[in-house]
UniProtKB/Swiss-Prot annotation:
HAMAP family to which the protein is assigned, alphabetical: HisC_aminotrans_2
Protein name: Histidinol-phosphate aminotransferase 2
Gene3D superfamilies: Aspartate Aminotransferase, domain 1, Type I PLP-dependent aspartate aminotransferase-like (Major domain)
Cofactor(s) required, per the database record: pyridoxal 5'-phosphate
Gene: hisC2
Family assignment from sequence similarity: Belongs to the class-II pyridoxal-phosphate-dependent aminotransferase family. Histidinol-phosphate aminotransferase subfamily.
Molecular function (Gene Ontology), one example: pyridoxal phosphate binding
Keyword terms, alphabetized: Amino-acid biosynthesis, Aminotransferase, Histidine biosynthesis, Pyridoxal phosphate, Transferase
Taxonomic source organism: Legionella pneumophila subsp. pneumophila (strain Philadelphia 1 / ATCC 33152 / DSM 7513)
């Protein structure tokens, strides 16, 4: 008798719609047989990674790579803590931010009477990982201008809310919540409810924020801030994220972490990248100029777009976006349609170099005109 393995997992996994990343350059080249491809789909740094990080990687010894990592004893811990103005015992290093969300759910929401809370059009990984663990999810609607209504989140939160997930700025919309609203949320929710503030795009929005969320950690020990080396530092391929939280929360995460979760190359590269302020400033300058370039192009074509504090813009095609998406693929340009978020008329485009942005806008004009 044959076994239907599809029926063996629990219902949460059987009904799961997996996260689908942006199409890769290799995948498109194989599908279309083209080689001149630009990827503006996954919010990667178009300048590449920090040159200081690359230099360290290129001079790495074979013995260093051959040894197992020891992240909690690596000098990155003290250096990152000093850079963030926190204590090393407040840091937890991770194989990207996604693993942070999973381990937090396992530790603080995986109970029969607990649920998580987020909002519509939030980063899809929160719901995917909660569903895989059969943790109930409550989601509040957002406003007409795509803003997150913090009062609605406060009203939806109760003693059974294990974790609130909020990305600030949000992905895939790019919308920023002002810090006073986040502070109000912290003051209103139960002390047993964790607020996980996903700040993957923090560096792009920092100039618009009046307060650093890390300043609230002492007053609000239920705050967990997550950040990453994937975006501004250009290290998405090395997978290194981190959480900043109360030491008691960090200790719990360390109890259940997988062994050797952060690799040697990522640790050394991040240690070097923290010092690369020239690269950070170049990345921010390119992003700011590219944002204006894309906005001007959209305005010329009367295309509506959402206000963004990230390194991407989400725009409205006013019809199903797949026709434009496929047209761009045929022209060697990878962007991100947002059907997975039930935003069927929208596309998210990463801000690229001036040349990449020009090529994208030219293709856009050719499609619409």
């Amino acid at each position: 008798m044959s076994i239907d393995f599809q029926q063996l997992p629990h219902a949460g996994i059987r009904s799961l719609i997996p996260y689908v990343p942006g199409k890769s350059i290799e995948e498109l080249a194989k599908e279309k047989g083209i080689t001149d491809i630009i990827k503006l789909a996954s919010n990667e740094n178009p300048l590449g990674c920090s040159p200081l990080a690359l230099s360290v990687i290129q001079t790495m010894s074979s013995h260093y790579i051959a040894t197992y990592p020891s992240p909690w004893n690596h000098p990155l811990m003290s250096k990152l803590a000093s850079y963030l103005k926190v204590k090393p015992e407040q840091l937890f290093l991770s194989n990207g931010s996604d693993y942070l969300f999973n381990i937090l759910l396992n530790c603080f929401a995986l109970h029969t009477d607990r649920h998580i809370l987020t909002h519509d059009y939030a980063f899809s990984t929160y719901a995917i990982q909660a569903n895989s663990l059969q943790i109930p999810i409550n989601s509040v609607p957002i406003g007409h201008n795509w803003e997150v209504n913090i009062t609605d989140i406060v009203n939806a939160c109760n003693q059974q809310t294990g974790i609130i997930f909020i990305a600030n700025p949000n992905n895939p919309t790019g919308v920023l919540i002002q810090q006073e609203e986040i502070k109000y949320l912290l003051e209103q929710i139960p002390k047993s409810t964790l607020l996980v503030l996903d700040e993957a795009y923090y560096e792009f929005a920092a100039s618009q924020l009046t307060v650093n969320s890390l300043d609230w950690l002492e007053e609000h020990p239920n705050l967990v801030v997550t950040r990453t080396f994937s975006k501004i530092y250009g290290m998405a391929g090395l997978r290194l994220g981190y959480a900043i939280a109360n030491p008691s929360i960090i200790n719990i995460l360390k109890r259940v972490q997988l062994p050797f979760i952060v690799n040697q190359v990522a640790l050394a590269a991040a240690y070097a990248a923290i010092d690369d302020d020239d690269f950070i400033q170049s990345s921010l300058k390119m992003n700011n100029e590219g944002m204006l370039q894309l906005q001007a192009g959209f305005n010329e074509l009367n295309i509506k777009y959402l206000p963004s504090s990230c390194n991407f813009l989400t725009f409205d095609c006013e019809e199903d976006s797949m026709a434009l998406y496929n047209y761009l693929l045929d022209n060697g340009i990878i962007v991100r349609p947002l059907h997975a978020y039930k935003m069927n008329n929208f596309i998210r485009v990463t801000i690229g170099t001036k040349e990449q942005n020009s090529r994208f806008l030219t293709a856009l004009k050719n499609f619409y005109l």
